[in-house]
From Swiss-Prot:
Interacts with HSPA2; this interaction may promote the recruitment of HSPA2 to the spindle. The modification Phosphoserine is found at S8, S19, S50. Expressed in pachytene spermatocytes and elongating spermatids inside the seminiferous tubules. Not detected in ovary (at protein level). Testis-specific. The modification O-acetylserine is found at S3. Residues 285-312 form a coiled coil. PbH1 repeats lie at residues 479-500, 501-523, 524-557, 560-582. This is Testicular spindle-associated protein SHCBP1L. Residues 1-25, 48-75 are annotated as: Disordered. It comes from Mus musculus (Mouse). Disulfide bonds: none annotated.
C-alpha cells in the first residue's frame, strides 16, 4: 500500500508507433495527472490515506473455518481449520478516548491555528504536524498500544463491515529520526498477553505479518492503551490531533494552491466540521458531503494504484482510463470546494432551486380541477358547479405535473409524497378536504427541497406538511407570492424561508420543530402573519451563541423586509420569539416605542430587551402573544 501511495509520476509514455492523437492525449495526461498525485508523495499522508476499497463481494476469512456446507455451496475450497489447541487471543484493553469531540470549536481553532500550525503555509503543514508530534514522542520511547491494521494484511477475503480492522496489542518503540516525516513509522512487537479483537487469529500469522513488515508500523495506526502515565496520555492526544487533521481538515489540493492565510482556511473547516456535528447542517446533506469526501479520497488511491500497474509503454486505452479517473477526481474536487465555500448552511439559499419554465394557461383557456384520491365518488364533487372540468389522479405528483396556471388541486384524506411540490412555477391552488391533520404530505428524504415556489400566486390550504430528511426550508418562496392557510407545518430542517423580493402570507397555521427559525425573512422580502402558532423551533444543537438566537420569526435586514403580525402566538422556542439580524450597530436607532405600539403584554415582558431597531425597518405588530421563549421575546441580533 505504501509503495503505491508514493508514486510520483503517472506512468504514461508514448511509443514510436503512436498516432498524433494518442501522443497528444498521453502528453496531456502526464501534465494533468501529475498534479493531483503529488499529495501522495508525503509519507504522512500515505499513512492516513483512506483504505483501498474491498475488491469483490466474497466475504470469508482465510484462516477462520466456515461450515463445510457453506464452502461447498459457494463452490470454493474448504479453508484449513485453526488447530484446536491454538490459544485464543485475549480481548483488547481499552484505549485512550479521543478528546476531539469534547473540545469546543474555539479550543480546536486555538489548538490547530495557534499551537500546531502557527501561521504555516499549506506546503509547510506536514512539517508542522511532524514537529508537533515528534516533540510529544520525545517524552516516552516505549509504551503499549493497539495496532489497528488493514485486514488485507491478514485475510484474503473479508466483510469490511464486520472486520473494519485487525487489532493487535503491541509494544511500541519510538526512535528519534533525523527526517521529520520518518517519525510516522515506529517499531512494534507483540505484547503479552497476546490480545486481539479476533479471538481465533493465530499468533504465528501475526508474527509472520510483522516479520514481513520488518516489525514496523505506521504510528497513526497505533492507539495508546488507557491507564499509562501522563506522557503516554499526551502522546495519545497528539496522535488524535494529527489523525483529525488529515482525516477532516487537510485536502490534497491544499499545497497545490496559493492560500495567503492557511490557518484561516483551517478555521473555516473546523467550523464546518463542528456545524456537521452539532446539527447546524442537517444530517442528510452532511452525510452527502462526507460520502463525497470519502469517494474523492478513494478515487485518488485508485488512480495511484492504477498508475503503479501501468507498464513503461502504456497503451492508448490505459492512457484514456487514467484520464477518466483523473477527470472524476477533478469533478469531485470541484464539488467539495463549492460545498466548502457555500458552507452548507441551512440558513442561506445560495442558488435557485427551480430551473423549470412556467407553463402558463392552457391553449383553450379553461382550467381543470384535479381530484387526488384513490377512488372518486359523486359525493366528492357534489359541491362543484356543473361546468367544472375534472381530472382524477391517485397520485399527487401526477396531479401537479398535469397542472396549468389557474388549476385547482383538491386532495382527499390520505398520505402523499410529491417531488413536484418543489417545482411550483404556475399559479395554482392546492387544498385539502376535511381536517388538515388527515391530509398528510411528507417530503422525500432523497430530495434537497420540499415545497418551493416561484409562481406569482400559489395557495396551499388545509394541509399537513411533514418534513423528513430534506435539507432546505420546509417551504421556500423564491419569488412571487405564496399563501399558507390553515396548514400544519412539522419541520425537520429550517422553517419557512422567504427570499429577497418574494412575499408570503400565513394565516391560521401552525409551525413547529424547525432547526432554525420558524419563519425566516430575507432582506427585501414581505410577510403577513395572522392568527398563527409558532412554537418549539430552533432545535439546533450548537454551542455557537449567534445561532441559538433564532426562534419563532427571524428577520434579516439591509434592505429591510416588511412584516405585519396580527394575533399570532409565538411560544416555547429555544431562541427569541422574534429576532432581527443586523450587520452592525452603526445602523441602529432608538425606536422602542414604535415597535411596541399595539403589542400585547407578552411583547413587553422585558422593556429593556429591545432598545434599538433599524431605521428603515417596516414592522407592524398587533395583539400578538410572544411568551415563554428561552432567550426572550424580541431581540436585535448583531451579525
Amino acid at each position: 500500500m505504501e509503495s503505491d501511495a508514493t508514486t510520483s509520476e503517472p506512468k504514461a509514455s508514448v511509443g514510436s508507433d503512436s498516432s498524433p492523437a494518442e501522443q497528444t492525449v498521453l502528453a496531456t495526461l502526464r501534465d494533468s495527472v501529475a498534479a493531483p498525485t503529488r499529495g501522495f508523495m508525503s509519507p504522512v499522508r500515505s499513512v492516513v490515506a483512506s483504505p483501498r476499497p474491498v475488491k469483490g463481494k466474497a466475504a470469508r476469512r482465510r484462516l477462520q473455518l466456515p461450515p463445510v456446507t457453506q464452502a461447498e455451496t459457494c463452490d470454493e475450497e474448504p479453508v484449513p481449520a485453526v488447530p484446536e489447541d491454538q490459544e485464543e487471543a485475549q480481548p483488547l484493553p481499552p484505549i485512550y478516548a479521543s478528546p476531539m469531540r469534547g473540545m469546543w470549536r474555539s479550543e480546536k481553532v486555538a489548538l490547530y491555528c495557534d499551537q500546531v500550525l502557527q501561521g504555516s503555509k499549506a506546503e509547510d503543514a506536514e512539517e508542522a504536524m511532524s514537529r508537533y508530534l515528534l516533540e510529544k514522542l520525545k517524552a516516552k520511547d516505549r509504551w503499549l498500544g493497539v495496532w489497528k491494521s488493514n485486514p488485507e494484511l491478514f485475510f484474503e477475503k473479508y466483510e469490511e463491515a464486520s472486520i473494519p480492522f485487525v487489532g493487535i496489542l503491541v509494544e511500541v518503540t519510538c526512535k528519534p529520526r533525523q527526517n521529520l516525516s520518518s517519525c510516522f513509522k515506529v517499531t512494534v512487537s507483540v505484547a503479552e498477553p497476546f490480545s486481539s479483537n479476533i479471538a481465533n487469529i493465530p499468533r504465528d500469522l501475526v508474527d509472520e505479518v510483522l516479520g514481513e513488515l520488518e516489525y514496523s508500523a505506521p504510528l497513526l495506526e497505533v492507539y495508546p492503551v488507557d491507564g499509562q502515565d501522563a506522557d503516554v496520555r499526551d502522546i495519545a492526544l497528539a496522535l488524535e490531533v494529527v489523525r483529525f487533521f488529515y482525516d477532516f481538515l487537510w485536502r490534497d489540493w491544499d499545497d497545490e494552491e496559493n492560500c495567503e492565510n492557511y490557518t484561516a482556511l483551517i478555521e473555516e473547516r473546523i467550523n464546518l466540521w463542528c456545524d456537521i456535528q452539532d446539527g447546524t447542517i442537517p444530517g442528510p446533506i452532511a452525510q452527502r458531503f462526507k460520502k463525497t469526501l470519502e469517494k474523492y479520497k478513494n478515487k485518488r488511491v485508485e488512480l495511484i494504484e492504477y498508475q503503479s500497474n501501468i507498464k513503461e509503454d502504456p497503451s492508448a486505452a490505459e492512457a484514456v482510463e487514467c484520464w477518466k479517473k483523473y477527470y472524476e477526481i477533478v469533478m469531485l474536487c470541484g464539488l467539495l470546494k463549492m460545498w466548502e465555500d457555500l458552507r452548507l448552511r441551512v440558513h442561506g439559499p445560495f442558488f435557485p432551486r427551480i430551473l423549470r419554465r412556467r407553463k402558463g394557461k392552457r391553449d383553450f383557456g379553461k382550467t381543470i380541477t384535479h381530484i387526488v384520491a384513490k377512488v372518486m365518488t359523486t359525493d366528492m364533487v357534489k359541491n362543484l358547479s356543473s361546468d367544472t372540468l375534472l381530472q382524477q389522479h391517485n397520485d399527487l405528483n401526477l396531479a401537479l405535473d398535469s397542472c396549468y396556471s389557474g388549476d385547482i388541486v383538491v386532495i382527499f384524506p390520505g398520505e402523499y409524497q410529491a417531488s413536484n411540490l418543489a417545482l411550483l412555477t404556475d399559479d395554482i391552488t392546492i387544498k385539502g378536504v376535511g381536517k388538515r391533520e388527515e391530509i398528510m404530505i411528507t417530503s422525500e428524504p432523497s430530495h434537497d427541497s420540499f415545497v418551493v415556489s416561484k409562481a406569482d400566486n400559489v395557495k396551499l390550504m388545509q394541509l399537513s406538511l411533514i418534513q423528513q430528511g430534506t435539507v432546505d426550508g420546509i417551504v421556500v418562496v423564491e419569488s412571487g407570492h405564496l399563501t399558507l392557510e390553515n396548514c400544519l407545518l412539522k419541520c425537520e430542517g429550517t422553517g419557512v424561508c422567504v427570499l429577497t423580493g418574494a412575499s408570503l402570507t400565513i394565516t391560521n397555521s401552525e409551525i413547529t420543530g424547525a432547526q432554525g427559525a420558524g419563519v425566516e425573512l430575507y432582506p427585501g422580502s414581505i410577510a403577513i402573519l395572522e392568527g398563527n402558532e409558532i412554537h418549539h423551533c430552533n432545535n439546533l444543537r450548537t454551542s455557537d451563541s449567534s445561532k441559538s438566537t433564532l426562534g419563532g420569526v427571524n428577520m434579516k435586514v439591509l434592505p429591510a423586509p416588511k412584516l405585519k403580525m396580527t394575533n399570532n402566538h409565538i411560544y416555547n422556542n429555544n431562541g427569541y420569539g422574534v429576532s432581527i439580524l443586523q450587520p452592525s450597530e452603526q445602523f441602529f436607532i432608538v425606536a422602542e416605542a414604535a415597535l411596541n405600539k399595539g403589542a400585547a403584554s407578552g411583547d413587553k415582558k422585558d422593556d429593556k430587551m429591545l432598545s434599538k431597531v433599524m431605521q428603515t425597518l417596516n414592522v407592524e405588530m398587533n395583539n400578538n402573544r410572544i411568551e415563554a421563549n428561552l432567550k426572550g421575546d424580541i431581540r436585535i441580533v448583531t451579525g
